[in-house]
Design a protein with these regions (language model features):
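Divalent-cation-assisted or electrostatically stabilized phosphate/pyrophosphate-binding catalytic cores
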Residues: 61, 114-136, 182-199, 223-227, ...
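Short acidic/histidine-centered micro-motifs embedded in hydrophobic/aromatic stretches
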Residues: 44-48, 93, 110, 158-162, ...
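C-terminal helix-coil-helix/basic helical segment that borders enzyme active sites and/or dimer interfaces
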Residues: 78-81, 211-220, 246-250, 284-289, ...
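Alpha-helical phosphate/pyrophosphate-handling elements in metalloenzyme active cores
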Residues: 43-93, 139, 143-146, 189-232, ...
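Conserved N-terminal diphosphate/IPP-binding helix and adjacent helical/loop segment
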Residues: 1-97, 103, 107-122, 171-187, ...
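All-alpha helical catalytic cores of prenyl diphosphate-utilizing isoprenoid enzymes
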Residues: 31, 35-39, 60-66, 131, ...
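A glycine-biased, small/acidic residue-tolerant capping/turn segment at secondary-structure junctions
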Residues: 41-45, 112, 243-252, 280-287, ...
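Short, charged, amphipathic alpha-helical segments
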Residues: 17-20, 157, 226, 317, ...
Length: 355
């Protein structure tokens, strides 16, 4: 392995190690939090988190989440010289709210599988899944409000503001599906960036801000690390949009082009439609002809036109730009060199994701 592949592979290796370390740090407290829920909600929460099967059989262990957000919380705290234990409440809280959002997203999107098995609503019913998501959200706030959590009032405020911003982003994303594909009222690149900064960037910003806050950081340090999280969140969303169109089914669990077939306004398509190119015009005509709901027969042509109009390249360039802005946000912030290396690795890992 030579050239760019070498550093990229090393960054991936470091980031995966950071995430695994973060999950090992939070798992005991995460399990203790879930145990505080009513028995049936705890069962469904543990099922969603990959701890056991539908009936509570621990032998049926599924894949757990990557723990990206807790990893960022720990790194932010370590950047300011705090021991990891100071950041545990924040790391647990962001993992809980992330999973709350996933449970509810699966309902809204009608997704029937996650991490290789039925989603919570598919397994237990919509009402039960809604309660499960609600329970995870309440546990997150309760974890930060606990008496032993330092600066707990500020911590809860940070979390709830991050979630409010996330809700704004989700609402925008939902509204986008009712907008025309092109012409007056179509989703613009500026609309997309605002929604991505809220929908995905806000919680990653909350994760890094919580780590800095619980480490005793001042306003400038918290703001710098929050900006890192927000920018890398947008980069992550841009990369995710590329994967949603061209990612291999073996890696994503979804058919190639699934985002486009479901009518989602993702960055490659928005950029292609705004390109003013012949390919972009042909893509717009195709989408209008099929009212934005493309079947298997139309998808290959739509993907080819999106790429020919520069949509894929634009999304990848935006991901790189946001990644560079994230790294610039913490460039002047004093921190241990190994922590800086791990932050850089996480930035590359979240931007150059497997397709």
């Amino acid at each position: 392995m030579t050239g760019a592949a070498g550093p990229a592979a090393k960054a991936h290796e470091i980031a995966v190690s950071v995430c695994r370390r973060a999950y090992a740090r939070i798992e005991p407290a995460l399990r203790a939090a879930v145990d505080r829920l009513p028995r049936h909600l705890a069962l469904m929460s543990g099922y969603h988190l990959g701890w056991w099967g539908p009936g509570g059989d621990p032998a049926e262990r599924a894949r757990t989440g990557k723990a990206v957000r807790p990893a960022l919380t720990f790194l932010a705290a370590e950047a300011l010289g705090a021991p990891p234990r100071h950041a545990v409440p924040g790391a647990v809280a962001v993992e809980l709210v992330h999973n709350f959002a996933l449970v509810h997203d699966d309902i809204m999107d009608g997704d029937t599988t996650r991490r290789g098995r039925p989603t919570v609503w598919q397994q237990y019913g919509t009402g039960a899944a809604l309660l499960t998501g609600d329970g995870l959200y309440v546990l997150a706030a309760d974890t930060l409000a606990a008496p032993h959590t330092p600066r707990s009032t500020w911590a809860v405020t940070l979390l709830t503001r991050a979630m409010l911003a996330t809700l704004h982003g989700q609402a925008s994303d939902h509204a986008f599906t009712r907008a025309p594909w092109s012409g007056p009222g179509a989703v613009t690149l500026a609309d997309y960036r605002r929604a991505a900064a809220a929908k995905t960037g806000a919680l990653l910003a909350g994760a890094t801000a919580l780590g800095a806050l619980l480490a005793g950081g001042g306003p400038r340090q918290v703001a710098r690390l929050a900006l890192f999280g927000r920018r890398i969140g947008v980069a992550f969303q841009c990369a995710d949009d590329v994967i949603g169109l061209w990612g291999r089914q073996s890696a994503t669990g979804k058919p190639v082009g699934s985002d486009l077939s479901e009518g989602r306004r993702t960055l490659p398509v928005i950029a292609a439609l705004a390109s003013g190119t012949p390919a972009g015009d042909r893509l717009a005509a195709l989408l209008h002809r099929h009212r934005g709901r493309l079947g298997e027969a139309e998808l290959p042509a739509a993907l080819e036109l999106t790429e020919a109009a520069g949509g894929r390249a634009a999304a990848e360039a935006e991901a790189r730009r946001q990644q560079e802005a994230a790294l610039a946000a913490v460039a002047g912030l004093p921190m241990p060199e190994h922590t800086r290396t791990e932050l850089h690795a996480m930035a590359h890992y979240l931007t150059a994701r497997e397709q």
